[in-house]
Swiss-Prot record:
UniProt keyword Mitochondrion, yes or no: yes
This protein's encoding gene: IMMT
Record's protein name: MICOS complex subunit MIC60
Function: Component of the MICOS complex, a large protein complex of the mitochondrial inner membrane that plays crucial roles in the maintenance of crista junctions, inner membrane architecture, and formation of contact sites to the outer membrane. Plays an important role in the maintenance of the MICOS complex stability and the mitochondrial cristae morphology.
Compartments where located: Mitochondrion inner membrane; Mitochondrion
Annotated source species: Mesocricetus auratus
Length: 22
């Protein structure tokens, strides 16, 4: 369960970084 939550957080951060990078 914790791993899933952590994975979602990581994906969210990556998506935000991609948007900012663009």
């Amino acid at each position: 369960v914790v791993s899933q939550y952590h994975e979602l957080v990581v994906q969210a951060r990556l998506s935000e970084q991609e948007l900012e990078f663009r």
